[in-house]
Amino acid sequence: EDTINLIKTFYLRFPQYRWFTFRDLRGLSQEEFANAISECFVSVWIDRQSAYGTFPLESMKVGVPVIGITPNLVPEWMNENNGIWIKDEILLSDIIADWTQNWLEDNISEEMYTNMKETVDKLPTKEQFENKTIELFTEYLELRAQSMEEQISKFND
C-alpha cells in the first residue's frame, strides 16, 4: 500500500513524469530480477522493517542508485554517500522528482556511483556468507556436543 500511495502522490504532484513507470519487482526469478533492476535509472526503497536491506545492495551492485526511507534499524553499510536516504516519507516524491530531473540533465555525481561500488565490494558474496554461516553453526554444534559429552561424563562418574 505504501508503494501505491507513493506512486499516486508522485504522479499527482509531478505529471510531467507520467511517461516513466515504477516497476514492482516482487515475484520475479533471481535472473529476471537482476535483469529488471539493471534496466532502472533509480531504485526506490520504502521498507522500514527490513534490517539489512538486500534490495538497495542489489541495486548498487548493478550500478543503480537508491533513494530510500531510512529503516528503523539502520544497516551498517548505509551512509550518506552511497544513496539518498531520508526519514520523512512525505519528501520522497519530491526527492524522486529532483533525482529524475538531475538524471535527465546528466547531473548525477560520479562519486555516488564510486561509493556504491565501494559499499558492495566490502560486503561478502552470497557464497562467502553461506560458507561463514555454515562454519559458525558447525562450530556451535561441535561446542554443544562437547559440552553435552562433558555433562554426561560427569553424570556417569
Report the location of each language-model feature.
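Conserved catalytic-core segment of nucleotide-activated headgroup transferases in glycan assembly
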Residues: E1-Q30
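Nucleotide-sugar-dependent
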Residues: D47-F55, P71, P75-E76
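Short hydrophobic beta-strand element within catalytic cores of glycosyltransferases
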Residues: P65-G68
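Short, well-ordered alpha-helix to beta-strand connector turns
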Residues: C40, G63, E80-N81
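Short alpha-helical segment that forms part of, or immediately flanks, the ligand-binding pocket
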Residues: A34, L57-K61, P75-E76
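Acidic donor-binding loop of glycosyltransferase active sites
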Residues: N35-A51
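A charged, aromatic-enriched C-terminal amphipathic alpha-helix characteristic of glycosyltransferases
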Residues: L104-N156
